[in-house]
């Protein structure tokens, strides 16, 4: 796991499609202050074009695909023209309907909006997101922001009506033809989605053409081109973005109906209708979806060509070239009078990413007696050329025309990302007697992003396996397959470009009309950077029993990364935000187990049951000199962060803890009745999973099959700022404790005419803890406090009550399929199948309240932090597949 990675680097497994790396860049994701998920590259791959997927694990895969694959490779092979028929047509259609999966369930319906147990006068605007008012009373009437007087009653599930039923349709047509040694396959897919959020939709159209042929049995040619067009309207803002509709709705008082906001989001002049005291961080979600719109368009071109010359039966030479070119435009608009953007704003982001990959290989295979051997030598050129331009326009003067010309103030920022890696590599493969195998590789990369002297690095690998079932001639009925394997690999990796020296850019400001330039670096250049080094070792055992009806695959691995390239924060007086250094050491150890079984097999019925399990320990052994922690991501409030902490597992959640005595009891301030917290930040949890697992099952009876996929993740923690908000605003059920007693005490105080400072409360919330006595001993705390004051204090001081074990068990998918019998359709069709599909239908177990446990800022450094999560979706639908 790297301590630092850029948006252009991939900390996950590398995707390779038909031998060509995929540009899986994410153009945007949520963070501390919000953001948008702008998608990635792999989502553009058409599932109907995929023939197979396989995984090359760990750094051993880097020998083939370079340092970009240091975390493994997902190999995707796409379909060619079918050789079964000279001409074939396939139609595939899927329609699903989406509904909310997660809802706000832990909600109290005893008290409504307001503060201090009261609702002030008839004006509700300043408490619409607070649930600390009086008890529900149908006899109490309030005049709301829209001028309508309504009774003070609970509106159950008051935010659910905001979400609608979504729908997704995907239609694919495939045409393929084969003649002699030539095949052509063409695919067109149309996908359209109407999201559960109002006024939100997307479409994606994909055209794929692949042709392959053999000339004179000597030359193999394989060409493929794919074009994808994607359009999205109103991607939802995430996390703490002011336009995040989920964040703005989740604390809405239970006596407040969201549909009032729908009917009154703007006034007669088209201006923002103030409903909550013009809170710039809690906007009317209907204004957001209609007047703070965004839209994006993306064009993706992928092309590849393979030319292979078969010199003779032993030697072949091949060249593969590929390109992945992406053009994306994202436009975000805020109409005038939008809180925070009163004069209006338009921001247009233009991304132009180009990735090129060329590979040449000479492959020789032969045998001598019982030996089989092969030698491969080759070279690779990998080049990235990305450009970004962001235009921000402010002060709108022509409100009816959403275009740059309608704004008087414009600012342009541009960015360039270019890098190139040239590689040479070779491999030797030996086999003896079909039971002993030995492979060795050596690869050298020359990176443009590292300094001279350190920009060329070698990394070797060696692996071996012993097929003992073949060597010992074990009874094939009992043990048809048994193999042990071992491997060792070393891999180096580079960093982003422009880290070695100063770079410059045009300043958005000018002097007397003349353009100014400025230093573009925000990180102190480091001309002595070295490549990161990772050493890994792996042992494995593969077994198959009882005529292959039981299969077991066990892997133990260890991996140590050193010379990590770390980005450390610097003081503002340096003129930079950070500096890059080589430091740090992280050690991974883990096991992976896969069990594949067929418990039942008869003539008409079979049952397949597959189970997988993985456990990983990711220990931070060492950081830099004098550095004990390295921040990965920070939360919005109270100095909570996810970090790499020396001596701890990667992904520690740090924050202030309750101050405790030696017995572990919470120490309470005797004067206020509120708990004390530590001055320093402490490890309160960890964002990484202790273990993960999955279960797939498939029942087949003749032409009917029923399959299900279960997902299990255990042991990670998450700091839920949504829960923090729910407690702070009095919406959670747990905030009921002490309210009745405190409000009764306050009535007694008011009747007695005593000031609050001179009154000893007779009821309220009592913190479970101790107070320190003058002699240093501790006594039980018995002081009553206002529950509203208590939860506001907790929300502002410590994250401890809002850090949850994020373990869960989910049903990811259920499919019921029926394949029509041949005798019914053979005169017209080759095959027809119909299926019922349920995706993410329900969560069997989760511990975190109200939200989906998969909710995080993002899937990278933001794991372990959550705020304002949109409800996850469950979908039900059907699929029809017809082959001619």
Model-inferred region functions:
Residues 22-24, 59-64, 81-84, 97-100, ...:
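Short beta-strands and strand-coil junctions in structured, solvent-facing domains, enriched
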Residues 13, 23-39, 72, 82-198, ...:
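Residues embedded in well-ordered regular secondary structure
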Residues 27-31, 37-80, 102-108, 155-172, ...:
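Outer-membrane beta-barrel proteins
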Residues 90-149, 581, 598-687, 718-782:
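Conserved small-residue
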Residues 115, 161-162, 477, 619, ...:
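C-terminal beta-signal and adjacent terminal beta-strands/loops
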Residues 1-8, 12:
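Single conserved hydrophobic/aromatic residue that forms the stacking wall/gate
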Residues 133, 204, 210-219, 224-229, ...:
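Extracellular/periplasmic, surface-exposed regions of secreted and cell-surface proteins
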């Amino acid at each position: 796991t790297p301590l630092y990675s850029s948006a252009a680097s991939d900390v996950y497994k590398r995707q390779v499609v038909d031998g060509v790396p995929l540009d899986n860049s994410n153009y945007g994701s949520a963070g501390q202050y919000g953001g948008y998920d702008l998608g990635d590259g792999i989502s553009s791959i058409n599932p109907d074009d995929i023939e197979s997927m396989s995984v090359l694990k760990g750094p051993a895969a880097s020998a083939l695909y370079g340092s970009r694959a240091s975390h493994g490779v997902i190999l995707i092979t796409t379909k060619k023209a079918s050789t079964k028929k000279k001409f074939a047509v396939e139609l595939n259609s899927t329609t699903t309907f989406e509904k909310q999966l997660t809802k706000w369930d832990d909600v109290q319906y005893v008290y409504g909006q307001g503060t201090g147990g009261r609702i002030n006068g008839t004006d509700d605007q300043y408490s619409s997101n607070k649930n600390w008012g009086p008890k529900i009373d149908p006899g109490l009437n309030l005049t709301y922001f829209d001028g309508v007087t309504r009774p003070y009653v609970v509106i159950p599930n008051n935010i659910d009506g905001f979400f609608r039923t979504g729908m997704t349709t995907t239609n694919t047509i495939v045409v393929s033809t084969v003649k002699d040694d030539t095949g052509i396959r063409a695919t067109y897919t149309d996908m359209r989605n109407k999201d559960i959020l109002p006024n939100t939709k997307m479409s994606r159209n994909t055209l794929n053409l692949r042709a392959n042929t053999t000339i004179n049995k000597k030359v193999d040619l394989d060409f493929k081109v794919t074009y994808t067009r994607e359009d999205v309207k109103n991607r939802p803002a995430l996390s703490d973005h002011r336009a995040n509709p989920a964040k703005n709705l989740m604390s809405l008082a239970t006596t407040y109906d969201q549909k009032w906001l729908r009917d009154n989001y703007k006034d007669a002049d088209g201006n923002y209708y103030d409903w909550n005291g013009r809170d710039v961080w809690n906007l009317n979600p209907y204004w957001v979806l209609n007047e703070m719109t965004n839209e994006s368009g993306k064009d993706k071109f992928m092309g590849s060509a393979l030319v292979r010359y078969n010199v003779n039966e032993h030697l072949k030479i091949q060249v593969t070239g590929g390109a992945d070119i992406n053009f994306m435009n994202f436009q975000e608009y805020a109409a005038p009078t939008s809180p925070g953007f009163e004069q209006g704003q338009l921001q247009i982001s233009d991304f132009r990413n180009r990735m090129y990959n060329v590979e040449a290989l000479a492959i020789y295979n032969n045998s001598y007696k019982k030996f089989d051997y092969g030698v491969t030598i080759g070279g690779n050129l990998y080049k990235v050329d990305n450009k970004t331009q962001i235009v921000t326009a402010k002060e709108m003067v022509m409100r009816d025309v959403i275009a740059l010309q309608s704004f008087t103030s414009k600012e342009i920022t541009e960015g360039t990302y270019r890098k190139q890696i040239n590689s040479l590599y070779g491999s030797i493969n030996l086999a003896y007697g079909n039971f002993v195998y030995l492979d060795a590789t050596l690869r050298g990369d020359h990176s443009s992003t590292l300094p001279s002297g350190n920009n060329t690095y070698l990394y070797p690998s060696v692996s071996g396996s012993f097929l003992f079932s073949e060597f010992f001639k074990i009874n094939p009925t009992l043990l048809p397959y048994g193999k042990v394997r071992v491997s060792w690999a070393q891999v180096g990796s580079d960093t982003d470009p422009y880290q070695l020296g100063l770079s410059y850019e045009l300043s958005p400001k000018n002097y007397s009309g003349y353009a100014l330039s400025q230093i573009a670096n925000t990180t102190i250049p480091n001309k002595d950077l070295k490549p990161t080094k990772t050493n890994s070792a792996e042992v494995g055992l593969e077994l198959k029993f009882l005529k292959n009806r039981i299969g077991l695959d066990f892997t133990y691995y260890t991996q140590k990364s050193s010379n990590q390239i770390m980005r450390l924060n610097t003081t503002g007086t340096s003129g930079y935000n950070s500096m890059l250094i080589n430091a740090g050491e992280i050690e991974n150890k883990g096991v992976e187990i896969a069990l594949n079984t067929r418990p039942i097999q008869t003539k008409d019925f079979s049952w397949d049951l597959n189970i997988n399990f993985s456990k990983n320990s990711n220990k931070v052994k060492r950081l830099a000199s004098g550095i004990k922690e390295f921040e990965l991501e920070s939360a919005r409030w109270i100095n909570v962060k996810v970090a790499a902490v020396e001596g701890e597992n990667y992904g520690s959640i740090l924050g202030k803890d309750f101050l405790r005595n030696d017995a572990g009891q919470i120490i309470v301030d005797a004067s206020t009745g509120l708990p004390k917290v530590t001055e320093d930040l402490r490890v309160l949890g960890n964002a990484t999973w202790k273990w993960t697992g999955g279960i797939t099952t498939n029942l087949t009876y003749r032409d009917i099959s029923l399959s299900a996929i279960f997902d299990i993740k255990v042991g990670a923690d998450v700091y839920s700022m949504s829960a923090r908000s729910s407690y702070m605003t009095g919406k959670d059920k747990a905030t009921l404790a002490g309210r009745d007693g405190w409000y009764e005490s306050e009535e007694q105080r008011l009747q007695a005419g005593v000031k609050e400072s001179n009154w000893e409360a007779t009821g309220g919330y009592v913190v479970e803890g101790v107070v320190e006595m003058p002699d240093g001993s501790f006594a039980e705390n018995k002081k009553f406090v206002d529950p509203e004051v208590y939860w506001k204090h907790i929300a502002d001081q410590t994250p401890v009550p809002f850090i949850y074990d994020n373990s869960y068990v989910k049903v990811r998918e259920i499919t019921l399929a029926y394949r029509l019998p041949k005798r019914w359709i053979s005169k017209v069709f080759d095959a027809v199948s119909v299926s019922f599909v349920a995706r993410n239908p329900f969560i069997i177990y989760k511990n975190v309240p109200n939200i989906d446990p998969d909710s995080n800022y993002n899937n990278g450094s933001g794991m372990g932090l959550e705020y304002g999560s949109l409800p996850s979706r469950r979908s039900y639908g059907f699929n029809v597949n017809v082959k001619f």
